[in-house]
Amino acid sequence: DTKYALGSVLNHVLLHQTIIGTEAMAQLEMANDYPDVIVGCTGGGSNFAGIAFPFLGAQLRGGKKVRIVAVEPSACPSLTRGRYAYDFGDTAHLTPLTKMHTLGSTFTPPGFHAGGLRYHGMAPLVSHIKELGLIEAVGYQQLQCFEAGVQFARAEGIVPAPEANHAVKGAIDEAIRCREEGVSRAILFNLCGHGHFDMQAYIDYFGGKLQDLDYDEAELAMALAGLPSVKAA
């Protein structure tokens, strides 16, 4: 007998991950600080929700307003280019149908190095708050994210995972925006993983073997055409 448990996309997984943001709030309280902007990378949504949801919850209960930015790969842009529709949360179609931003459960993203972000659909709760306008979403190409990761490693002595490079790139862009606007903002981002097991990706980057990848429009259209038909009750 086999049981199938997803580690992302489903809402209960997001709930468990909120320990990340809860701990971040406690740490910031110790530092007597609070973020103006929160940046997180997104694939299925668990890491992003983990850092963002506690702060969003505080905001909705009357707390300080924060800008929340979800960063995803341009090659797998479920939030920025996907359709808000009912779909399966997995390619095997074992999950319940949930309403999400999706590229279609049969969509196969190109093989870029941030494997944890190669997911066709976004968690229902993350999708819902995007529809409500509570978060923003932006897509980045692979090479600019690796460039940001190298910059971070040289400055901080920590090599980020390719997935985390997306959040690093988003945070750097927010800092540049502050400089251009002449304002000071506290920027919080989640470095969700180290790159110790991704050295080959960095070797390929420095060797000029990586390239920016885009999704196939025809394949995306075919995947979206196969979305389940759901009739309203």
Residue spans of the language-model regions?
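Phosphate/ATP-binding catalytic cores across multiple sugar-kinase/actin-like superfamilies
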Residues: I19-Y34, D173-R177
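C-terminal structured "cap/appendage" subdomains that terminate the fold
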Residues: A153-G195
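A short, small-residue-rich loop immediately preceding and capping a beta-strand
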Residues: Y34-F48, I68, R185-L191
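Conserved PLP-enzyme active-site core in the AAT-like
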Residues: Q17-G21, F48-A49, F53
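C-terminal, active-site-flanking charged/polar segments
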Residues: R67, L188, C192-A201, Y205-F206
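Short glycine/serine/threonine-rich phosphate/pyrophosphate-binding segments
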Residues: C41-A52, S78-T80, A164-I172, H196-M199
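Active-site/ligand-binding loops adjacent to catalytic centers
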Residues: D1-L14, I20, A31-N32, G57-L60, ...
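Buried hydrophobic packing segments
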Residues: M25-Q27, I51-F55, G149, A167-A175
